[in-house]
Amino acid sequence: MVRLSNLVSCLGLASAVTAAVVDLVPKNFDDVVLKSGKPALVEFFAPWCGHCKNLAPVYEELGQAFAHASDKVTVGKVDADEHRDLGRKFGVQGFPTLKWFDGKSDEPEDYKGGRDLESLSSFISEKTGVKPRGPKKEPSKVEMLNDATFKGAVGGDNDVLVAFTAPWCGHCKNLAPTWEALANDFVLEPNVVIAKVDADAENGKATAREQGVSGYPTIKFFPKGSTESVPYEGARSEQAFIDFLNEKTGTHRTVGGGLDTKAGTIASLDELIASTSAADLAAAVKKAATELKDKYAQYYVKVADKLSQNAEYAAKELARLEKILAKGGSAPEKVDDLISRSNILRKFVGEEKEAKDEL
């Protein structure tokens, strides 16, 4: 009977130790955390704590991500409401509290980063050199900012749209997939940044205070060259965010990351095309383009020059580009270029059709 009891006890202990997230109690804490020589990230939680409940699925996923390296690092948790002596021993005053133990001493380091999977995984990897494993996910295009990086991210050459969020906030959770989609929509815009600050994390609270954040999510736009923000007060749909950014930054994105019919076009040159005779168009466009720094100004010059030699050039070239786009398979950057050039060609084709109608 004693042997069976011991066996059950051992099996229970083994189960606790080999689980993705190790359940720590006074009986095994010292052996697993303090004397093992193996570092550990430990969450001190209480079952009734709302923030703890929100963290629970993320923390379980974290344990799974490092389960392959259980001989190198431990992801553990302590019910500090039941085992209050353990909580008091390490100065736990609120829940959840996360602490990093080096496996050699009883003086842990407070974890002050974000409570999302990416932040927690990065912390463990930086400490141990161990990389997380799990279902392959496309890396997020949202730039995570904190107290150390925020000031360097705004006020420079980029337009920055920032969401100040908290992991326990229901509205923030609803916003998250839209925010990810928005970041993907603008991934090819080198000077537009979609960012996020975990305002509930220790390394994000100071920035949130400085920015006057009092509720979540709070969304602010920082124009390039300015550290003064513009509050975003519109709808929280992907389309609404895209419309806002297109207006503020001069981009032409659509839902899904494509380009609209104005992308690549230059209003002043379009007006010139509409008001200049075919005979004078090439010279007029070339002269006007010399004063422009726009990426596609010289493409206008090229098309106008080609048209002066072949009146069907724009129509034929447009048909060729549309065929390439319809076929698919081009790199995203190439698709952007094809759409922009097609939009420009349509300006010339429209003028050609009007000229033929007059004849």
From Swiss-Prot:
Keywords: Disulfide bond, Endoplasmic reticulum, Isomerase, Redox-active center, Repeat, Signal, Stress response. One of its GO terms (cellular component) is endoplasmic reticulum lumen. Induction: By stress, and tunicamycin. The record marks R115 as: Lowers pKa of C-terminal Cys of first active site. Residues 20-129, 131-250 form the Thioredoxin domain. It holds the Pfam family Thioredoxin. One of its GO terms (molecular function) is protein disulfide isomerase activity. It catalyses: Catalyzes the rearrangement of -S-S- bonds in proteins. Its EC number is 5.3.4.1. The record marks R236 as: Lowers pKa of C-terminal Cys of second active site. Disulfide bonds join C49-C52, C169-C172. A motif (Prevents secretion from ER) lies at residues 356-359. The active site is at C49 (nucleophile), C52 (nucleophile), C169 (nucleophile), C172 (nucleophile). Belongs to the protein disulfide isomerase family. This is Protein disulfide-isomerase tigA. It comes from Aspergillus niger. The gene is tigA.
